[in-house]
Amino acid sequence: MSKYTTYIFDLDGTLLDTLGDLAASANYALRQFGFPEHSTDDVRRFVGNGVRRLMERAVPPGLAPAQFEEVLATFRQHYMHHAHDTTRPYPGIPETLHELRRRGCPMAVVSNKMMAATQELVAHFFPEIPVAIGENEAEGISRKPAPDTVNEALRRLGVERHTAVYVGDSDVDILTARNAGLPCISVLWGFRDRPFLLQHGATQLITHPVELLSF
């Protein structure tokens, strides 16, 4: 039996393999402006800090700010219509979430993805998760690694901080958990590998979602 009762999950690279759709939308936006496209492995390195940072890393250096905003808007529009063309839960995730729900464990998703995309993907793939919080700087909720999204998730769930664990796949997630005062479980099926995670302070790592049930 797990020692945790509340689970705060990252989305991309933790619950969902979104890399193909992110790469497709990034390259679509780049293509519309005649810019070089990137491999999926390139995009894997770009993700983790929200779509603005993804596209800042994807566009050619020195791009004028006004044109960058056009590229970003093109990405956002395309992605909202193609967010689950190839996106799927990682193997073992649906079964693990089902068991956590059966046990009565409160769950939430916090992401640096756009709020609308975060909520749409969670509603589509994980209706058992009642709280999904995405990037929402306009509402005063700073993106990760600031603790704001986690704090808001705990507030909406109505749970105490000491009951919760944060689950994610990146260095941003490790920092987010630390800033929020939560233990962090780092997953090895996502966008970052074991050496990278250990280098960035990971202390608890798992290789399959079912391990969450007895960690």
Which residue ranges define each predicted feature?
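Helix-loop "lid/cap" segments that line or gate small-molecule binding pockets
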Residues: 29-30, 50-64, 153-154
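Short acidic-hydrophobic, aromatic-tinged amphipathic segments that line or gate anion-handling sites
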Residues: 204-208
